[in-house]
Amino acid sequence: MRNIYFTDGSPEGFFTAVFDAYADKDAFVSSSKALQTALDDRFIAVSPVGEKAQRVVKKLRAVDKNSLCEIDFILRTPAADREQTAFDYIRLLVKQRRPVRGMLVRPEVRRAMELVDRVGAERHLL
C-alpha cells in the first residue's frame, strides 16, 4: 500500500508534500491527473503551506544551494514522474547531507540528472 501525496503542481505545494511525506517510507508524490493507482493506495491531498515549504527550502540551501535550481528544472519537465523523482533526490540529498549530483550509480540521482539535462538541452534550442 502506497500513500500518494497529491499536490496542486505548484513549487510551494510540492515542497509542502516533501515536508509531509519525508518520513513515510511508502510515500509517492504526484500532481498527475492521469496517475495509475492500485486498489489499496491511500490518497493524501496536500495544500500548499508556506511555512512547511520554506523549511524544506531552507534545509536544501543548507545542504546544497545548487540543488534548488536542479529541482526547479526537474519540476519543469513534462515527465509523469517528475515530482517523485525530485522527492527521491531530495530524500537522498538530506540523508547524505552533502551534494549528490555526482552519485550517478544511484538510480534516483541518474533519473534526476537525466531530467535536468533534458531541460538544459531544451533551453539551448530556444
Show the residue positions of the predicted features.
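Generic marker of "main functional regions" within proteins
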Residues: F15, D24, V29, L39, ...
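A basic- and aromatic-enriched beta-loop-alpha substructure that forms the phosphate/nucleotide-
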Residues: A53-L104
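Acidic-enriched, low-complexity/disordered segments with a strong bias for Aspartate over Glutamate
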Residues: D8, D20, D24-D26, D40-D41, ...
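Internal, well-folded beta-alpha domain core
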Residues: K95-L126
